[in-house]
Amino acid sequence: FKRIIDTCKLKNIQVEVYDNPLFINKNQDLSSFFRSDKKKFFQTSFYKQQRLKLDVMMIGDKPEGGKWTYDDLNREKYPKGKIPPTITYPEKNKIYTEAFNYVNDNFNNNYGKINEEIIYPYNFKLAKEWLNAFLKTRFEEFGPYEDAVVKERSILNHSVLSPLINIGLINPKHLVKSILDYYYQHNIRINSCEGFLRQIIGWREFIRGVY
């Protein structure tokens, strides 16, 4: 980005930078934290600033529950014999079938393996259903098993919402509101809500600012 700006200045080209709706922060929101005179940037400091600015899980200027993070509660092993929540994937359609056959016919020797079934939602309706399914079946235990790994299980209690946010099927501001509404209405455990929101308003926005 800096090289683009510098080159445009050199060529006397006027630059207009637009805010990206795929992120919560505007460009000017990031400039105060990611200053050029700072040598190090810490995600924890950024995250606290985000919580205060967005008034997310705050009681005045104090974090709800008395702690900024509950990461120490989010490292449990998945219990032996516990059955993970059922995942309902989108139904395969004609377009996906055509794409699947095309890739197999023309790139059969390439690395990787393409799934015969659709994994991710591909429109706004399916994205909304996917979010609601996460809230109802996986959100409550998202926190404790956030770092858990089980052989032959790829999702467990994760949301798998990142691809949908990254391509604009779910707006991050709407996502934060949906998470908070469900948290308060259904008495979801605090470490699950905080741990999830830290990924959205903390890590995701922080890494964007770093880049």
Residue ranges of model-derived segments:
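Beta-rich, aromatic/charged-enriched effector core domains that present basic-aromatic interfaces
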Residues: 1-119
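Catalytic cores of enzymes that engage adenine nucleotides and/or redox cofactors via long glycine-rich
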Residues: 73-211
